[in-house]
Amino acid sequence: MTDADLIKHLWTHKTQDHPSWSDEDLMIERGEGVYIWNRKGRRLFDAYAGLAVVNVGHGRTEIADAVREQVAKLAYYPTTRQFSNPPAAQLAARLAELTPGDLKYTLFAVSGSEANERSMQIARMYWLKLGRPRKYKVISLTHGYNGATIGTLAICGQPDMVRAYEPFAWQGFRKVAVPYSLWERGAGTDEDLVRRCADGLTDAIREEEAETVAAVILEPCLSAGGCIIPPLGWLERVRDICDELDVLMIADEVITGFGRTGKWFGVEHEQVVPDLMSVAKGITSGYIPLSASIARAKLADAFPENSLEENVHPNTYCGHPVACAAALANLAIIERENLVKNAQTMGARLHAAIEARVCDYPIVGEVRSRGLMLALDFADPGQPGQPLDSRLVASLNTRALNKGYIAVAKDSVLRLARPLCITASEVDELAHLVGETVHELQDEVTRSARSRAAVA
């Protein structure tokens, strides 16, 4: 069978069309470092690290060796019914060392969506264990994205992603404004913006009645929402509000965790310790699916003998020994090669290099970044204060492919999330490619505006 015949049976998430690229062209066969190759041998710069997941880069033989060794020794046994396995126990201990504060107890799962589901379940069960069953509601952020299950879609702050699934069977979810968006910013300083949104969160909890709110869940930086980077001070205010009103704080670190923002975890930019932390993606760099919910001691203490068997249900693959072995090898690479620091250094270099190339283009409203999360937000030159037509921005997906790199363009934003192992020369290469792509788009917008003016 040809590749085309095989692909007919694969139900992919086709969110963009690439007119000049066939499905066979987009079948990726191998990867090394920041690059991937399709079946025809075409090299592409993976400027989105798969889905912001391949933190250590492609082709790491150390992880493959760890997986091979573990499969030969013990390919599978779950962490349920008091059973465990060495890789799961070792990884839980390692996470207790890496995570801030007293986040010391880990419940493993498979995907980021599931980790957030688990975190919400633990939050609800915690209050139930304390004899406060009315505390079941969860507050999330507009523009936020916390997963693709029905439960996590219920807290999703992006209406176009959830409309088809409404109404939700689960009740008790509310969204509040996130303190950053180029198009919704309004007047005032960053401090004013944080204050307004913090007041909005406080008001929402009080309107719902604090005795009915279990948790607030938020991403330190909102990736799928457009790489929104709230001003410093926001996480600290959320922590204070949660403490004041007796509500748990859940940090969704599925994307921001394990070095992506230039710190091991996104909350560390403000020295904040959440009550629960959801992690995935960078825990194994995507080599094998794995996720986790990590809880503070006070939550674990509420469960008999720190056991979650009752009501917080395990799944078949929790604590999978092969996935945990991959994670241990992955974390060793991140630490040994100082990739967290590299994310900070190379992220700053890329931001400066891209900004220097595009800052004079009228269509560029803003370049923003934290570590190796970066976004270009595009503005409509003909309508001040308005984003560029999303169809034009979406064309950047194919424009980037034609230039030889992969990025994600949606709504008004082009997002980049490179592997943490990126080098200075690779940063410069990517900045050049992005600059050329934006130049092409600017030319098209300028020509279109001139054509309309000539007709008028």
PLM features: residue spans?
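Conserved N-terminal phosphate-binding loop of PLP-dependent enzymes in the Aspartate aminotransferase
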Residues: 1-456
